[in-house]
Swiss-Prot record:
Name the record gives this protein: Methionine synthase
Domain AdoMet activation residues, every copy: 899-1226
GO cellular component: cytosol
Classification of source organism: Bacteria, Pseudomonadati, Pseudomonadota, Gammaproteobacteria, Vibrionales
B12-binding domain span: 748-883
Amino acid sequence: MAGSNIKVQIEKQLSERILLIDGGMGTMIQGYKFEEEDYRGERFNKWHCDLKGNNDLLVLSQPQIIRDIHEAYLEAGADILETNTFNATTIAMADYDMESLSEEINFEAAKLAREVADKWTEKTPNKPRYVAGVLGPTNRTCSISPDVNDPGFRNVSFDELVEAYSESTRALIRGGSDLILIETIFDTLNAKACSFAVESVFEELDITLPVMISGTITDASGRTLSGQTTEAFYNALRHVKPISFGLNCALGPDELREYVSDLSRISECYVSAHPNAGLPNAFGEYDLSPEDMAEHVAEWASSGFLNLIGGCCGTTPEHIRQMALVVEGVKPRQLPELPVACRLSGLEPLTIEKDSLFINVGERTNVTGSARFKRLIKEELYDEALSVAQEQVENGAQIIDINMDEGMLDAEACMVRFLNLCASEPEISKVPVMVDSSKWEVIEAGLKCIQGKGIVNSISLKEGKEKFVHQAKLIRRYGAAVIVMAFDEVGQADTRERKIEICTNAYNILVDEVGFPPEDIIFDPNIFAVATGIDEHNNYAVDFIEAVGDIKRTLPHAMISGGVSNVSFSFRGNNYVREAIHAVFLYHCFKNGMDMGIVNAGQLEIYDNVPEDLREAVEDVVLNRRDDSTERLLDIATEYLERAVGKVEDKSALEWRDWPVEKRLEHSLVKGITEFIVEDTEEARINAEKPIEVIEGPLMDGMNVVGDLFGEGKMFLPQVVKSARVMKQAVAHLEPFINASKEVGATNGKILLATVKGDVHDIGKNIVGVVLQCNNYEIIDLGVMVSCETILKVAKEENVDIIGLSGLITPSLDEMVHVAKEMERQGFDLPLLIGGATTSKAHTAVKIEQNYSQPVVYVNNASRAVGVCTSLLSDELKPSFVEKLDIDYERVREQHSRKQPRTKPVTLEVARANKVAIDWASYTPPVPLKPGVHIFDNFDVSTLRNYIDWTPFFMTWSLVGKYPKILDHEEVGEEAKRLFKDANDLLDRVEKEGLLKARGMCALFPASSVGDDIEVYTDESRTKVAKVLHNLRQQTEKPKGFNYCLSDYIAPKESGKNDWIGGFAVTGGIGERELADEYKANGDDYNAIMIQAVADRLAEAFAEYLHEKVRKEIWGYSPNETLSNDDLIREKYQGIRPAPGYPACPEHTEKGALWELMNVEESIGMSLTSSYAMWPGASVSGMYFSHPDSRYFAIAQIQQDQAESYADRKGWNMLEAEKWLGPNLN
């Protein structure tokens, strides 16, 4: 049957049901207990070496046995037979000196399976059976040295593998295979050689069969034998465009589940799995029964992971029969629609999407650009050369560029040697490789050494179209992305126009003629040196920057790269100025859309850190703003060559320093003083018999005082956090001594805390962790955006006593339900704590607690956490605590079930009929003074401080009261003053040292309302819709008011009035996460939380400032507005700025529309998680409405008819609608 027809037929089957692959062939053969003579048969009875164990040979010596096994699997329900050719390549057959029989074995195996499959298809024509020609991994590995003393050695080459696989593929096709199955991949480079061979044979024979790919995760590390993660492995072979991608062997279904789940999420094609029947026992046997295995398969299928299922080692026809029973009628996994992205990999994946931040390509492993690296390669000091690569990765390079083009080097041999050595260093090989050479043979040699998906640097049209197309096709077959230089037969592009012309021509050839994915095309439009003294060179940087923007606009999904250090070449020897030039140049390139650059990752300067006078001079040069810009830069360049800054701090002794060491430690803990904690802790250690006694004695005594004072309300949360910082520093000093003496101190329990997947907010979680640590609980904090799999895996590994989940956005509630279900499925017996801004006792009782049989406790604030944990971990207190909890939850559920809305629900039709009544005929919407997009980069923090609303800041620290009155509060006033001072001191540092960056943008677009939605137009002609913003409407009875919807405040399309809508996104948190992590690493939880709280306030202040500027200057409908900060906080202005995820527009995915409309991530670097949380966490976004009647409102509960209408307008099915509208669905 023709390959294309087979593909269509199989894809139809896969879309309708879960197909079954057969089970273990080796397992069935072992059941016959064959001896040497059985393997030999008559034909090979005089073979010169032992043949026992050569299972593939049985297709020649015992074909009836193989036929019977195939028959048994088809009778059990299998749809796809695998040929008995797992070890039938010439390379594997060499173990038996049978290389010459490889072709025959593959042919006969396919022919035999074909006959059996055709027989069963004839019996049941409505269920066709297919033959998958199997190409196994061979017994050699192309990525790993078999010699521990020589990590660069290989016992098989890429070309040898291609030759062996090509012979097998031809025979499998000739024998009648419907598909080619590349399976049990433990080394992805072997599989890349195999796929290269398969595609070459397809081209040679002018036939294309569907290809199935199946890898092997070898152990609990979640990686292949050669070290790749599931996603990295997928990215490396995605170019094959297989019909299915899957996992098999090594693990049983329990261990393999997590990785099949990952694959089902990332794979654009169908997903297969054929696990082992559990893990082998002490005798090498597999114990998982068909019924038990089918139970796992049923759960996988119902979870939506599967399109094909089968078995590997230890499985039998009975296993397949039971699987067939449990998947019958279960809907197969639906293919996901994934965003267009360049998906690269080393040992780990690197996905570059439209909204990704700038990608740094390390440049120092290049003999033409690094004298040190060239010397090391020339002297064959490869170990030291590897350290150069590792330094680049450690300094932030996400890709490393490797170039060996030097006249006195054998570039091809050096490239192969170095890449093979890199493969043995996980800290280097975790990132993708850019194979860089001007010689095609060197590029090909490099591509044959990298198992991940790398990048070729580079090809061009310099030698004509024919050669360009030939090389591009091979690069695609090797599975790499490509950099295309702006170079053709005329020469290098040095003007903006030539750059566009060449890149456009190359793009059209690659996409339209070669079939190269546009997202894997990276253009290098040539970076040339500026400030050379030659006038013709002055505009080189401007030409590049402008060409970047043109290419990004006109060549969809293509990316831009370049060798950044070229631009500053005329200042070689003055690294300070060169780094300033790089910083300025990159800043402008990135703003225009540049995706990546080849840079020295260890010497990247930050744009804002360049001194203002130098930055201005550099910008004059880069942007060609003045005729004398080169001379002005030269004048001040020398001044910066050896600039240095020093700082001395004085310490002063205090009276309490004369106290006994135990009291000094207590004083430091209570007062939060870190200055002397290490020396006092050391003194206490010397006085103690064992170092652990210092923790269990004076330090815990001091923390008990802190806990008592906090419990009595005499200390407040900020002070407790400072105390924890002191404690951490003391413990950090003692840890080496404790470890050396193998002592273990007692704690009250071990608690795992995590912000769930898709959510980036963790201030509350961090505070809870600190409070619990102060009460002698060991805390394992996994941070933010933590997957369910990671939470539960670490919980098991660390043997924790309690798991605590946190989240701020509403989609996190569903993720918490998922975690609870998984804990129940996996048999956890730990209490589960639930907390975060969107959580509630009602949601916990109704949605979470009923999915998990162990205690699930809603913790509404940090002060309650200690009491809850104490009760849950106490044998005496737990029974009564849980009993009261159960009674309370039952009461909450009853209240929820009886709860009636304050007003009755109405139909959507009725609600729409009661929309806000606005007389549009007598109202003219204001036209913006400055329409379009406005970007505020590195905005002045001092301006934002004037717009801070401090009341929520104190609430973060559990100090309740309104600012400024809280500063004079009888109980908390003194602590509020200290906290306020610390925050402002930190803000002073933020301003002075640039610790945080604030970035923001707003945009004003022509718009009209169409029913409940808002059409946003590309321009003032209003002929093309750029985006539709979808809205919900209040859906309860409103006898004296309206059923509000945000679209009511935009002029209807039919009114003929030209209205406008605004959008904005701001962050005050660029750098906040890194700072917080740095403070945490130094044991300073107080400042870690403080920087987060301050960043949050700056983000909200930025939103307030920008809205005012829009009203007064940009939109300009309130030019004479004069409001105090208090007036602004009280919203006494005209217009509103509702935010997706909040009451007036509670559905979070509308942020995605806003991001696309304004190009937020490209413009200012803010991104969205899978749950539509904003990153950085200290961010605000929303829409601007100008109508004087516009007001805030809450949607509350909606009915089924509105959910269906909303789903239809969004293009969702109802499952998707229920997921995102859940909190509002009645």
